[in-house]
């Protein structure tokens, strides 16, 4: 880690720099303190984006820069593809919306001309609702990178549980806590400043908190709830192998990946600014790319087939043997 008196990035260094949501290759032209009279003030960097006109040269804070490593280049490529896909999707929706609007235009104009005062009040109320909805959708969104193999694993996971009536064997072979600890251990040496380390720690803490609160509310399929109830009794009792354990120690990669699939909707309900949103997206995307590369290590290779008694209980038809059946599953 560079000392406070030394800049993390040097003049003429090749780097990657964020411009809005995308990382671009750039070169550092100059380095200075944000306050020339205070040598302890943060550094800022004059960057030139490769292939761009000099008029785009800009002084940027350190948190917009990334080292020019293979890992960060892969992230830059992935973020660009995600942004291009989102732009194409948005363009398609806009075109369809305009076409539908023009088709309804004359009829709507005629209707509004014939509407009385009460109708105008209704229209105003409708416009207010539309304005609220548009405000919601203009909040910074977090398009987390979800590699194809993780998407495929999510589909298989859904089919195993909902169609095949199977459940993941729990405790998982690698818990959520263990997976996150492994990621941090590998990621820490790459963090060149205390600020970057602080961000990493905050994000990991946030993931744990989200998982803990979201598990029984949105991450479980209905068929898994009986298994969850049985496990919860064990860790709340705090006896045996479940002593001082909780969801983060019992569940693993399958349910953690489900969380990341729902994370954009969860974050959309917060009031983060664009800069914070972009940084969070970068951190979460780094994790999904890492998990994708290590999927063989963390995901279950097989699911457990539920007993008939468990199936009946999951449908709300308890039987005398159901409790024992649930216990055998966990």
UniProtKB/Swiss-Prot annotation:
UniProt xrefs under InterPro entries: Chromo-like_dom_sf, Chromo/chromo_shadow_dom, MRG, MRG_C_sf, MRG_dom, MSL3_chromo-like
Residues in Tudor-knot domain copies: 13-66
Ranges for region Disordered: 86-125
General function of this protein: Involved in deacetylation of histones, chromatin assembly and chromosome segregation. May act as a transcriptional oscillator, directing histone deacetylases to specific chromosomal domains. Component of the NuA4 histone acetyltransferase complex which is involved in transcriptional activation of selected genes principally by acetylation of nucleosomal histone H4 and H2A. The NuA4 complex is also involved in DNA repair.
Localisation: Nucleus
Protein name: Chromatin modification-related protein eaf3
Predominant location category: nucleus
């Amino acid at each position: 880690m560079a000392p406070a008196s030394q800049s993390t990035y040097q003049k003429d260094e090749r780097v990657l720099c964020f411009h809005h949501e995308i990382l671009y290759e750039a070169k550092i032209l100059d380095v200075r303190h944000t306050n020339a009279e205070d040598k302890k003030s943060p550094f800022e960097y004059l960057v030139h984006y490769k292939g761009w006109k000099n008029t785009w040269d800009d002084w940027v804070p350190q948190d917009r820069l990334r080292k020019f490593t293979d890992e960060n280049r892969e992230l830059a490529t992935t973020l660009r593809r995600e942004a291009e896909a989102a732009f194409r999707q948005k363009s398609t929706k806009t075109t369809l919306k305009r076409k539908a609007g023009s088709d309804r235009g004359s009829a709507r104009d005629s209707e509004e001309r014939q509407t009385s005062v009460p109708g105008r009040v209704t229209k105003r109320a409708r416009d207010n609702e539309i304005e609220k909805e548009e405000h919601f959708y203009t909040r910074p969104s977090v398009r987390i990178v979800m590699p194809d193999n993780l998407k495929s694993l999510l589909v298989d996971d859904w089919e195993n549980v909902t169609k095949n009536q199977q459940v993941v064997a729990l405790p998982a072979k690698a818990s959520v806590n263990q997976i996150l600890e492994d990621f941090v251990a590998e990621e820490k040496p790459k963090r060149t400043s205390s600020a970057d380390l602080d961000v990493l720690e905050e994000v990991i803490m946030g993931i744990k908190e989200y998982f803990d609160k979201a598990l029984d509310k949105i991450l479980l399929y209905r068929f898994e709830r009986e298994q969850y109830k049985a496990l919860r009794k064990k860790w709340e009792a705090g006896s045996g192998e479940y002593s001082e354990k909780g969801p983060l120690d019992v569940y693993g990669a399958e349910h953690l990946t489900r969380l990341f699939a729902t994370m954009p909707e969860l974050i959309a309900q917060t009031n983060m600014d664009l800069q914070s949103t972009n940084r969070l997206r970068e951190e979460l995307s780094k994790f999904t790319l890492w998990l994708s590369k290590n999927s063989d290590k963390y995901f279950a290779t097989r699911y457990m087939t539920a007993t008939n008694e468990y199936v009946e209980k999951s449908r709300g038809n308890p039987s005398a043997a159901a409790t024992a059946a649930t216990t055998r599953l966990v």
